[in-house]
Amino acid sequence: MTTILVSLANLLVVSLLVGAMFGIWLGYNPVNFPPTAYLEQQQHAIRALNVTMPILGKIGTLLTVASAVLARDDRLACALLIAAVVCSLVAGLVTRFRNQPINAKVMTWSVQTMPTNWTTLRDDWWKWHITRTLAGIVGLSLLIVGTLVERR
């Protein structure tokens, strides 16, 4: 029963996290936003997600580690779950060291104080968002397969 509950919580948390990342990728490409719209949208998203998303990432990573430990007698499932942890760590590190420093800068801007290179920072943020989203999608896929093979 423990394995089922950990797997359920793991799949739920990681799916919520990666789903949010995918939704941003799908619906919020800022490339064509005028400066005012970009700033309003980005600052709103940062305020709304900058605490919740990293918490979900940490919980999801810990649950995936727990799932791997519980699957330690099944080499394939354990290996898939460890690979999912690696993807989760990649997404987390990209977020922490690439996206969040840009977020911190954006939060200090007003329309009047946006730097002349704001589009460079916007494009860098977007590139790193795509990177972490792909890592998240691969990680979620590995988690799902690792969970399914473990159940067989």
Language-model-detected regions and their locations in the chain:
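Core segments of transmembrane alpha-helices
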Residues: 54-67, 132-141
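Mid-bilayer segments of alpha-helical transmembrane spans in multi-pass integral membrane proteins
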Residues: 89-97
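Interfacial loop at the N-terminal end of multi-pass membrane proteins
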Residues: 3-7, 13-59, 105-123
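Alpha-helical transmembrane segments of polytopic integral membrane proteins
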Residues: 25, 99-100
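Juxtamembrane boundary at the C-terminal end of a transmembrane helix
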Residues: 146-152
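Interfacial segments of alpha-helical transmembrane regions
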Residues: 2-15, 63, 69-90
